[in-house]
UniProtKB/Swiss-Prot annotation:
It comes from the Bacteria. ATP binds at L29, R30, G71, K74, T75, T76, E137, D138, Y139, R180, Y190, R227. Its main location: cytoplasm. Mg(2+) binds at T75. Homohexamer. Forms an RuvA(8)-RuvB(12)-Holliday junction (HJ) complex. HJ DNA is sandwiched between 2 RuvA tetramers; dsDNA enters through RuvA and exits via RuvB. An RuvB hexamer assembles on each DNA strand where it exits the tetramer. Each RuvB hexamer is contacted by two RuvA subunits (via domain III) on 2 adjacent RuvB subunits; this complex drives branch migration. In the full resolvosome a probable DNA-RuvA(4)-RuvB(12)-RuvC(2) complex forms which resolves the HJ. This is Holliday junction branch migration complex subunit RuvB. Residues 4-190 are annotated as: Large ATPase domain (RuvB-L). It is found in: Cytoplasm. Belongs to the RuvB family. It comes from Paraburkholderia phytofirmans (strain DSM 17436 / LMG 22146 / PsJN). Its EC number is 3.6.4.-. Gene3D superfamilies: 1.10.8.60, P-loop containing nucleotide triphosphate hydrolases, Winged helix-like DNA-binding domain superfamily/Winged helix DNA-binding domain. GO terms for biological process: DNA recombination; DNA repair.
């Protein structure tokens, strides 16, 4: 798992932050209000109504669960919610809250209607989660004082607050925890037009000269993810300052991204290595993941957790009962003629069932 995390951190098209410097860079570019937030129109519209209603009633906003792939703006939305409500935000993450006392200390220090943001909430320990249930429902927590026979339970009242939980794996949340969120929002991948608007806004904040076609060139290679779009913009800006007097056109962006091994659909060297192995070493598949891992010299976890998700989501790779299969899109992307067998992919499933 360590190797998987290391590879994800090294890829320029990774959806997770790659360094503390990048996290600071992201904070500087974050929109501060809902009206500045680009994309996720449905989620944004819902939050506008719920926040305004809570403010008119002078109540805390209902608890919010944000889920979806990394890099789509869950943390940004948590900060915006607190700012729109005019309250403080306390931020932590599931793995950090190891003991019940850690959570109790946070909850007892919240002021009225404050927002508590827990990232990776699916990684809360069961002990901490048990403390959270009464806090979410009744704004109370039970803590144990003393040890052994003299131990006793004390009930503490809390100020009304809003929990904003973020997760990339909603399926790992327990049902009791999931049921306590009144507002549940899934963040989707962005289209190229939305990402181009984000790139243009970020370039303005960075005082970078960018043409609309340059912004779109970056956007269409950003894998539907604002975090990747902003990271690519930083690298393209560096290239433009050295090679093009700081002027980012489509041609400059294309040259910069080719230098970074990011192709027209956002694939990097590892994506292409995996797909080309399936095409050339295994005749398009099906191939088992262990054989594929050996062929490209990567760990199985790296393939399943880092490389495959985007390829499958975009329709370039298919998982079948017999293994991984390259799709027609993959053949077209590499300029290859698809064999007749690839047009009969359902047959793979049929043969597996017999």
């Amino acid at each position: 798992m360590i190797e998987t995390d290391k590879l994800a951190a090294e890829r320029i098209i990774a959806a997770t932050p790659v360094s503390p410097n990048e996290e600071a860079f992201e904070r500087a570019l974050r929109p501060r209000q809902l009206e500045e937030y680009v994309g996720q129109e449905k989620v944004r519209g819902q939050l506008e109504i719920f926040i305004e209603a809570a403010k008119r009633r002078s109540e805390s906003l209902d608890h919010v669960l944000l889920f979806g792939p990394p890099g789509l703006g869950k943390t940004t939305l948590a900060h915006i919610i607190a700012r729109e409500m005019g309250v403080n935000l306390r931020q932590t993450s599931g793995p950090v809250l190891e003991r019940a006392g850690d959570l109790a200390a946070l909850l007892t220090n919240l002021e009225a209607n404050d927002v508590l943001f827990i990232d990776e909430i699916h990684r809360l320990s069961p002990v901490v989660e048990e403390i959270l249930y009464p806090a979410l429902e009744d704004y109370q927590i039970d803590i144990m004082i003393g040890e052994g026979p003299a131990a006793r339970s004390v009930k503490l009242d809390l100020q009304p607050f809003t929990l904003v939980g973020a997760t990339t794996r909603a399926g790992m949340l327990t049902n009791p925890l999931r049921d306590r969120f009144g507002i549940v929002a899934r963040l989707e991948f962005y289209n190229a037009e939305e990402l181009a608007r984000i790139v243009t806004r970020s370039a303005s904040l960075l005082n970078a000269q960018i043409h609309p076609d340059g912004a779109f060139e970056i956007a269409k290679r950003a894998r539907g993810t604002p975090r990747i779009a902003n990271r690519l913009l930083r690298r393209v800006r560096d290239f433009a300052e050295v090679k093009a007097d700081g002027n980012i056109t489509a041609q400059v962006a294309d040259a910069a991204l080719k230098m970074l091994d990011v192709d027209a659909v956002g694939f990097d060297l590892m994506d292409r290595k995996l797909l080309e192995a399936i095409l050339h070493k295994f005749d398009g598949g099906p191939v088992g993941v262990d054989n594929l891992a050996a062929a490209i010299g990567e760990e199985r976890d790296t393939i399943e957790d880092v490389l495959e998700p985007y390829l499958i989501q975009q329709g370039f790779l298919q998982r079948t009962p017999r293994g991984r299969v390259a799709t027609l899109l993959t053949y077209r992307h590499f300029g290859l003629a698809a064999p007749d067998s690839s047009s009969g992919l359902p047959g793979l499933w049929d043969s597996a069932a017999t």
